[in-house]
């Protein structure tokens, strides 16, 4: 799974040729989530509220970077790292 960012132990990843709508995958320990890029809506999640809050804050700051990586992944192009939340 191509990792595009990591912060506070949270791993953000995207799959190549993944199904629409644009989204990214989150892993934190045994917790997982799928979050839409355009609306930041949860598609699937068992993240704790604290971790989810950090991820949504990060995604709101980097929505354009996420969409760019989504388009890259759809065309099998290398993904770009996204600045972590500090």
Regions inferred by a protein language model and the residue ranges of each:
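Basic nucleic-acid-binding interfaces
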Residues: 1-86
């Amino acid at each position: 799974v191509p990792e595009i960012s990591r912060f506070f132990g949270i791993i953000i990843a995207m799959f190549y040729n993944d199904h629409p709508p644009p989204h990214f995958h989150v892993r934190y320990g045994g917790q997982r989530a799928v979050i839409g890029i355009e609306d930041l809506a949860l598609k699937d999640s068992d993240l704790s509220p604290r971790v989810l809050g950090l991820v949504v804050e990060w995604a709101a700051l980097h929505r354009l970077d996420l969409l760019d990586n989504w388009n890259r992944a759809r065309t099998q192009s290398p993904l770009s790292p996204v600045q972590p939340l500090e």
